[in-house]
């Protein structure tokens, strides 16, 4: 799936994703209301291209300041990427997990990327690993993932869960492993894929170090595979209520 961006004037700092009602400018707090703390000040309209080349606007987001993002990531500062468009990933570094085993965890107060889009024109492998987050969820609610192989491994959330609620996962593989969650105010320790929309994608778990719940409530997918293996632990609960998933494989569950 191909996306393009066009710079736009945005003096009101209004951002939205998927539908203009999902915006930081809203009455109440139904949708994410924070915006990034590492923005560049540059706003873009994001368009999805159909196979015929027709453009459909799907978001209006801010481009992050990548130099500042790299600094915040490696200096363990609080990171908010809400309502951003991210298509550069050098700030994560270039080491794969087996090259950093034994390194100390980096500790953050919080990391969120709600209503953000992560996009690569060509399939790209990226890692979020060896992180300890003190407060809130590792939150990708309403986010979009395009053409990525995303590994989220060796993550500890002291007072939160991993959230992909209402995310759009397009031609992307998400691998989860070694995740420990402290739970949140309303939910026991879990990884949530509630209400996701996925197409031509794959979601996998392996080498789980805690008995977590996985929630796919009302998930809608096309040509998407979910492969769940909790070893050496077991799953606490699995929820597929009202979900439509192309293929589910359970191993050692």
What are these model-predicted stretches?
Residues 6-43, 49-253:
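Tandem repeat scaffolds
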């Amino acid at each position: 799936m191909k996306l393009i961006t066009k710079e736009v004037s945005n003096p009101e700092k209004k951002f939205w994703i998927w539908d203009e009602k999902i915006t930081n400018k809203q009455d109440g707090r139904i949708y994410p209301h924070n915006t990034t703390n590492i923005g560049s000040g540059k706003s873009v309209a994001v368009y999805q291209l159909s196979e015929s080349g027709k453009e459909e606007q799907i978001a209006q987001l801010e481009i992050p300041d990548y130099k500042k993002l790299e600094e915040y990531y490696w200096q363990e500062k609080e990171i908010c990427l809400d309502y951003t468009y991210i298509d550069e990933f050098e700030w994560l570094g270039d080491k794969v997990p087996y090259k950093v085993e034994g390194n100390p965890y980096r500790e953050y107060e919080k990391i969120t990327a709600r209503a953000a889009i992560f996009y690569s024109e060509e399939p790209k492998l990226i890692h979020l690993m060896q992180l300890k987050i003190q407060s809130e969820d590792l939150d990708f609610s309403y986010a979009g993932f395009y053409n990525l192989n995303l590994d989220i491994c060796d993550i500890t959330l002291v007072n939160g869960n991993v959230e992909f609620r209402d995310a759009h996962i397009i031609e992307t593989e998400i691998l989860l492993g070694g995740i420990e969650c402290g739970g949140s105010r309303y939910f026991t320790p879990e990884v949530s894929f509630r209400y996701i929309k996925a197409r031509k994608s794959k979601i996998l778990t392996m080498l789980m170090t805690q008995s977590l719940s996985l929630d796919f409530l009302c998930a809608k997918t096309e040509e998407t595979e979910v492969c769940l293996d909790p070893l050496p632990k077991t799953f606490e609960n699995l929820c597929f209520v009202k979900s439509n998933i192309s293929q589910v494989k359970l191993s050692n569950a």
